[in-house]
C-alpha cells in the first residue's frame, strides 16, 4: 500500500514527540499490514516521551511510538496463511527469534534477542503498523475496541496474578497504575479473599476501590504494614504483587508478606533495592518471582477466555479518557500526573 500516514514519532534525543506525516510501512513476505483502530498509552510510552535514563539508553530516534493496539488487517505478505484481510487483530509486542535457549524451552517471553514494537521497531501510534504474522492475535469482534486495545498490558496483569495461586488468598497490590488496576478485577473474579490496593494518588485509589479492592491504603499517610497485618489476623498478605517498582514499597511488601507467601514483581525499580534476605526471605520461606511480559501464547489464550467470560465489562471503568491520536499530549500529561486510568487514542 502506497501513501502517507499520520504518526506520533520520537524524532529527537530530547523530551517530547511530534506528529509527522510518513510513508505507510512496506511489508515483507511474512508480515501483515494493519490499519490501527485504537491504541492505548503505556507507561513505557511515557518513559520515551519524557526521555528518562532508560529511554536515553534504549531508544534510537526517529521511532514511531506505541505498542498496545487493535486494528484491521488490510494487506498480507505472500507467505502469510493464518491471517486474512479484514481480520480484527492485536499483536504480541515481543518479536522473538524462536531459536535461542529461552525460546526453545517454552520461555519465548524472555527471548535473548527480543525486539519490542514501538521501542526497537516502529509502533502503533500511527494510522498503520506492520507486524510479523507470528505476532498477530485474531480478536473476538464482540469485544469493544477499547478493551481489545489494552490486551497487551492486561496480559502483564494476568501473568503476574496467575503466576501462583490466588483463590481464597489475601493479596496486596502495590501500585495502581493501569496494570495494577487491571489486577484488581482479575483477583475479585477469581476468588481472592481480600485485596489491598496500595497507591499514593487519590484518583487511582478511588478507582481501585470502584474496581473491587476491599481496602485501599495511602502509603504516604498510613502504616501499610500495620494495616495489612491487623486485617489478616497478624499473618500478613499471602500474595504480594508489585506493579510500582518503588524500592520502599517493595521492602515494605517483604515485611508484611506472610510466611510461605509469594511476591511477584512486574514493576521496574530505578535503583537497587536493599532487602533483609535473612529475615524477610529465608526465614519466611517466601518465593520471589520476576515477571516479564506475557507467556507466549498461554497468557493470550487466558486473556481471551477471561474477556469472553465477562472480564471485558469489569474492565470498562479502567478506560477513563479517549482522545484523537493528534491530541496524544493530553493523554501523556494525564499519565504523568497520575490523574487517569487507561488512555486510548484513535488515529
UniProtKB/Swiss-Prot annotation:
Catalyzes the NAD(+)-dependent oxidation of L-threonine to 2-amino-3-ketobutyrate. It comes from Caldanaerobacter subterraneus subsp. tengcongensis (strain DSM 15242 / JCM 11007 / NBRC 100824 / MB4) (Thermoanaerobacter tengcongensis). SUPFAM superfamilies: GroES-like, NAD(P)-binding Rossmann-fold domains. It catalyses: L-threonine + NAD(+) = (2S)-2-amino-3-oxobutanoate + NADH + H(+). PANTHER family: L-THREONINE 3-DEHYDROGENASE. GO terms for biological process: L-threonine catabolic process to glycine. Binds 2 Zn(2+) ions per subunit. Homotetramer. Pfam families: ADH_N, ADH_zinc_N. Pathway: Amino-acid degradation; L-threonine degradation via oxydo-reductase pathway; glycine from L-threonine: step 1/2. Its EC number is 1.1.1.103. The keyword NAD applies. This is L-threonine 3-dehydrogenase. The active site is at 44 (charge relay system), 47 (charge relay system). GO terms for molecular function: L-threonine 3-dehydrogenase activity; zinc ion binding.
